[in-house]
Amino acid sequence: MKIISYNTYKCTQSKIDHILAMDADLYILPECFSKEHISLHEEYDMLWCGDDDLTEKGLGVIWKKNLSVHVIPGYKKIKHMLPVIVNGSGFPKFILASWPTVWKEKKTYPQLLLEALNEYSFYLDRFPSMVVGDFNCYIGQNGVRKSKGTFEDCIAEMERRGLRSLYHEQTGEMFGEEKTPTFYWQFNQDKPFFLDYAFSTM
């Protein structure tokens, strides 16, 4: 199963079309329009979570209809995380689509991610799992209190559950020492960050 995660900053239909042309089975799309504001080919379906007054900036999950994707029972809204079970490509898998967001929220990005990891621990422990998306988190993050949870705590929690970062596993790089940024603050090449991750037990 091919999975693509891509932040669709200032989402447009042309961006969606470009991403879908990459021919993945499942897409995790932070900063995505809600389903009502984009057009999808009939072979695709979509889930979305976000704020009703900010429909151009939520978390979208798009998949080919040969897969079965559904939100877990009793889903608790954590901004913005979508916990889904995926069937149709071998054995069932649990995927926690992730875009921790502090819009109208008093918690920090790592705090939200850590909350989701604990909330969905039942599924992380029982299914082949992936936590994937734009985490809005990095090592030594400013404005984050240790008492509330840091990204280092999030990494430790995922590793404790057998989730490993695919990027770091493949490159051998250390967290906080990534050579390939995934984001440039204000499009400034002198302000690189590594914010996008895929942690997996698969």
Language-model regions, residue ranges each:
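N-terminal, active-site-proximal structural segment of metallo-dependent hydrolase catalytic domains
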Residues: M1-E42, D51-E56
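Active-site-proximal beta-strand elements of phosphoester/diester hydrolases
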Residues: M1-Y9, F91-K104, V132
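Catalytic metal-binding/acid-base residues of hydrolase active sites
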Residues: Y9, F33, S68, W99-T101, ...
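Short catalytic/ligand-binding loop motif for oxyanion handling, primarily in non-cytosolic enzymes
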Residues: T12-S14, K35-I38, W103-E105, Y138-N142, ...
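Glycine-rich phosphate-binding loop signature in dinucleotide/nucleotide-binding domains
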Residues: A21-M22, G88-G90, Y123-F127
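Metal-dependent phosphoesterases centered on the DNase I-like endonuclease/exonuclease/phosphatase
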Residues: L26, L113-A198
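Structured beta-strand-rich core segments of catalytic domains in phosphoester-bond hydrolases
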Residues: C32-V102
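Surface-exposed cleft-lining segments at the edges of enzyme active sites
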Residues: V71-I72, L96-L114, I139-R145
